[in-house]
A protein has these predicted regions:
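Generic detector of bulky aromatic hydrophobic side chains
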Residues: 13, 17, 111, 143, ...
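Anion (oxyanion) recognition and catalysis
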Residues: 24, 63, 140
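C-terminal active-site subregion of NodB/CE4 polysaccharide deacetylases
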Residues: 1-6, 136-137, 141-170
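Metal-dependent polysaccharide deacetylase catalytic core of the NodB/CE4 family, i.e.
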Residues: 29-132, 152
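Terminal accessory/targeting
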Residues: 1-54, 60, 133, 164, ...
Length: 170
């Protein structure tokens, strides 16, 4: 159905109020995960997101209804290096180095702390549920994070599939 509005306005004014009403009616608490931007850069050069109003709006609404916040990725590129071959399965780029992944994740964590200074981020959900061996080594660096358990997938990717939570040890 056509609502005659932009995608951003649709989410803010139509979809989100419906989701909050659903959560209230059924005592559901949401988990929101942050993606700072959708740029495809994977060289470790990061730029702080300056359009923060929507992050704060949705994040604070989730927290106000008893939900939790976490991380999804600096730019929705999976934490994978050049030894990962997505084949035709996924349209993603790989990171140029482990250091580049670290810089991007540090920027994401700093951004999350700036947006929600009193909140402990408790979840890491890999972009498209893809987490390479190199990416897995980085997850313990994310403070107090939990991760969906994963199964090994060919081409050195890990695809998260289970709904059981696994506490990642530092």
């Amino acid at each position: 159905r056509d609502y005659g509005t932009s995608i951003a306005d649709f989410y803010t004014n139509i979809w989100w109020p419906d989701m909050i009403a659903l959560a209230t009616a059924h005592n559901v608490q949401y988990t929101g995960v942050i993606i700072e931007n959708y740029e495809d850069e994977t060289d470790g050069e990061t730029e702080r997101q300056d359009d923060v109003q929507r992050f704060q709006y949705f994040g604070n609404m989730i927290l106000h209804q008893g939900g939790e916040l976490g991380y999804h990725g600096y730019n929705h590129q999976p934490l994978s290096l050049s030894d990962t071959d997505y084949g035709d399965a996924l349209p993603y780029k790989t990171w140029t180095s482990f250091s580049a992944m670290e810089k991007a994740m540090k920027e994401l964590m700093d951004f999350g702390k700036e947006m929600f200074p009193e909140t402990t981020m408790s979840v890491y959900v890999p972009p498209s549920n893809v987490l390479s061996e190199a990416g897995r080594k980085m997850v313990p660096c994310i403070p107090r994070s939990v991760l969906l358990p994963a199964i090994i997938f060919p081409a050195t990717m890990l695809m998260c599939r289970s709904l059981k939570w696994l506490k990642m040890e530092s």
